[in-house]
């Protein structure tokens, strides 16, 4: 044991501060405090080898217990997913679509939607109409058609450029935007037919008159 009484108060306080002990009091109190601390530390270090072996032997047992617990926990966790997979298989059976009229009806609707022609925008219709009219105008100028027809085509081009295509017009029918209507016979056609009928009637009357005249002469 060190001779603390030969040390100064400053040295004793330094030792006490290093050991985290109180530095208050007289020199004798400081010396007694250091001696007591040495005895306590010596008593802790004097542990029998048998006690150390017992402590070391008990530690692996304590360590082995958590290992066995981890193994059992892993087994329980691995068994849980099997239970959760069963409802998924049941859901697969439930989600299978049933074959029937509804399935065929939806397929027919999809096929009809895919085959339907896309609707043209007004600008696309205008471009298509101008292309057709310009071709007609070029053809009319090339083959020397009447100036009235050429002027009519030019007016149609100007009208389409300003107002677009009228869906009720003949031009819309030529472009295939609307179905062709069964137009009734115009008044001129009726007049021509009536004229033909009248001409046929006159020819019959004249033939009858000629026949009668020839009979009188005989």
Swiss-Prot record:
In this chain, composition skew of type Basic residues spans 204-218
Answer whether the UniProt record assigns the keyword Phosphoprotein to this protein. yes
Q: Which residues form the signal peptide?
A: none
Query: Which keywords has UniProt assigned to this entry?
Result: Phosphoprotein
Q: Which segments carry the region annotation Disordered?
A: 37-123, 177-218
Which residues lie in Polar residues bias regions?
Answer: 47-57
For this UniProt entry, the molecular function terms from Gene Ontology, in alphabetical order, are: chromatin binding; double-stranded DNA binding; RNA binding
Skewed-composition ranges (Low complexity):
102-122, 186-203
Please give the superkingdom of this protein's source. Answer: Eukaryota
Q: Which family does the record assign?
A: Belongs to the SAP domain-containing ribonucleoprotein family.
Q: How does it assemble?
A: Interacts with SUB2 in the presence of RNA; this interaction facilitates RNA binding of SUB2.
- The name on file for this protein is Protein THO1
